[in-house]
Structures are given as C-alpha cells and as structure tokens.
Design a protein with these regions (language model features):
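N-terminal amphipathic/basic leader segments beginning at the initiator methionine
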Residues: 2-39
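Acidic, glycine-rich loop-and-beta core segments that form the ion-binding/anion-interacting portion
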Residues: 180-221, 225
Length: 385
C-alpha cells in the first residue's frame, strides 16, 4: 500500500493528479444523473455507458451520429475565465448537426483534454454539459478527462463531444426532394455560435486592440459577453414541424451559408440567398467594418462551386460526411471579399430549412423563421444576391 501511495504522489508531481480526478468525477455524479431517464442503465464511472434503446414508435429506426468541438471560441472562455457556456455550446452544436437529418438526440459523451485538471473549470464545464443535455432531452452517459502535462498551455484545454440520435428511416431529411421553386427559410442565430472565432479574435483583439472586457461599439455587451453567447439548439423547434414538410436542413457552422447549403442541395439545384432579406446582427457589421471587408455588392465573385469535404477553421466546424480538412488561423487580417463573410460567419442565420412554397408560411410561423431565398435550376451552387 505504501508503494502504491508513493507512485500516485510521483504521478501527481509529474502533473497528473489521479486522486483529484477521481474526486471530481464523484462530485459531478448529481449533475450527470439529472440527464438520465429510465433508459440509462449501469452506474456512473464504468468502462462504458449503457443505454436501453426502445423505438416502438418507429418503423425502421436509424441511428445518427456526430462528433464536434468548439474551436477557438475556447480562447475567449480562457480569457473570460468562464467555462459553462462553451460546455453548452458543444452539446447544442452536436444536437443541431443530427437534427439537420431529422434525428432526435439519445445520448452524449464528452472529452476534455487539459494541461492540468482544475476543479472550478471542470465543474463549470460539467454544469454546461448537464444543462444543455437536460434541455435537449439527451442523456450524458460518458466522458473522458485527460490530463496531459506539456501538451497544452497552462490553464488551457480542448473539448470534443460525440452524440448519438435516432430517426425513423422514412422521416430522414436528406435534401433529395428539394426542387426548383422551393422556398429557403432562415432561423436566426445567437451571434457567432461556434464559428469564425480565429478571424473575429484577429479583428477585435488585435486590429481593434479591444479587450474581452471592452464595451463593443453600439452595444450594451462587452467583447467577451458577445463572443460567449451560447450556440442555439434548434431541435425542439424543428421537432414541431409535421414530418415530411421540411425537405432539407443545413446547420450553418464552419463554411457559413455558402458552403453548408451545398451539403444538402441536389446537383441540379442552386440555392439563391437574398442577403437583404434579414438584418445582419451588429457583431457581424463590426467585424465587416473593421476587418477591411467590402460591403456586399462592392464586388461580386462568381457563385462558389459545390464542395463536399472542406471546411473553414476546423470545428469551427467539422461535419459528418467525411473527415474534413482544417485550415490554419489567419496570420493577418487582409481585405476579404464580401462573399467570404458568408463563408466564414453565419451572418445571423444559424439553421436553414428548405420547404415547398405552399408550406412556407406554416413552417415560418412554427420556426419563427424568415424567408431568405429560393431554389432554382442550376448545378449545385450557392448564389448570394
């Protein structure tokens, strides 16, 4: 026993405190259990999570999976010393990704990689996971916390989340029924969500020389408060729309409106987005004015061609159609073509739905959405007007 005790102490001195990790995991059991229903079996802390799947209301249940992270939004959490919101961001981002296929969430697992485990940070993250999982009706059934001295800067960590949901096969939303003449609806975002943060930080913190505690121009919020707005969960609203009404859904993450619409468009259809149809939130106007970004209409590039497996800024959004290429953060803020604003940021639209014209008014009312464009015959492109 004395030998084991010495080994644990030596490991802690090397930067990995196993005892602290075990204590923290015991302390968060109450938060985790709040997300559990009768379908979750077994005890917390086992080698795997157990979930009893029963889908009596489905003819042909199909499991839907997604994995994602929060990107460099974490840098704002570090600077603000506030961590619960990025925990919720992670859950909501994953929920939205599977909701885009018509699925409802079943369970979620998290990963935290850190330089050293800090009790207060760990507690805030788990509060964020738990709160968002409860709101989504999703069980938090497992996680991994890895202490890796030398891998991260002091006080920093990385997050990843994996979600599993289910959809009845006849109700899968995959875009195949989209056709020319259909209406495109946009659901409002809550700020940047989890995308474009490398460029936003470059503009706000380096070019404008603001601090996270600085008040944003023409806003009651500080830079940090604005950038830590929580990624919206759209699944509860989408679930209210009658099955078969929505033909296609695009979660507007890394790649913005321009690229994410391409992921659901049939090859013979173009998405025409009328950018004057909604008011772009102030944070994007600030970024555009101060990032040497041209006003829409000053230059007009040809519509971007269809891309299936490329994304901007890593998980500032990863997707599930394949392993997606991540690009490095910009080394300087250059003049950006106006179309790039719609390829980096969500520009105030967090989810897009494609419906037939006859259903548009009904779905707009349910989703509290705006009509932002239409589908026309084409070759699988996004056009910005």
């Amino acid at each position: 026993m004395k030998f084991v005790g010495r080994k644990k102490k030596a490991y802690a001195s090397a930067g990995v405190d196993v005892d602290l990790g075990n204590t923290l995991k015991r302390n968060i059991q109450r938060l985790v259990r709040r997300t559990h229903g009768a379908e979750v079996l077994g005890k917390i802390g086992g080698f795997g999570g157990l979930f009893r799947a029963q889908f009596r209301d489905m003819r042909e249940p199909v499991l839907v999976t997604s994995i994602d992270g929060v990107g460099t939004k974490l840098k704002i959490a570090f600077a603000m010393n506030k961590h619960d919101t990025v925990g919720a961001d992670l859950v909501n981002h994953c929920v939205n990704d599977i909701a885009a296929l018509g699925a409802r969430p079943l369970f979620f697992l998290d990963y935290i990689g850190c330089e050293k485990l800090e009790a207060r940070v760990f507690d805030q993250l788990l509060h964020g996971f738990s709160r968002a999982c409860r709101s989504a009706g999703c069980a938090l059934i497992g996680g991994e916390t890895a202490q890796m001295p030398g891998m991260y800067r002091k006080g920093e960590y990385d997050l990843a989340g994996c979600i599993v949901g289910v959809v009845d096969r006849p109700k899968i939303i995959d875009g195949r029924k989209i056709k020319p003449g259909d209406t495109i609806l946009g659901l409002p975002s809550n700020g940047l969500h989890t995308n474009g943060y490398s460029l936003a930080r470059k503009i706000l913190l380096e070019k404008m020389r603001l601090k996270v505690s600085s008040r944003l121009p023409r806003s009651t919020l500080t830079v940090g408060e604005e950038l830590l707005r929580v990624h919206k969960n759209y699944q509860p609203l989408l679930a209210k729309v009658p099955a078969g009404t929505i033909k296609g859904l695009a979660h507007i993450t890394g790649g913005g409106l321009t690229d994410n619409l391409l992921r659901v468009l049939p090859k013979n259809c173009d998405a025409v987005i009328e950018t004057k149809r909604w008011r772009v939130p102030g944070i994007f106007q600030i970024l555009q004015r101060n990032g040497n970004v041209a006003e829409p209409g000053e230059s007009r590039a040809a519509p971007l061609t269809r891309r299936r497996q490329s994304r901007q800024e890593g998980t500032e959004g990863a997707g599930q159609s394949g392993r997606l290429i991540q690009s490095a953060a910009p080394s300087g803020v250059e003049r950006i073509d106006p179309e790039e604003m719609y390829q980096v940021f969500n520009m105030g639209i967090g989810m897009v739905a494609m419906v037939s014209t006859r259903d548009a008014a009904k779905v707009m009312s349910i989703l509290k959405a705006k009509q932002i464009g239409h589908i026309e015959r084409g070759s699988g492109k996004t056009q910005l007007l």
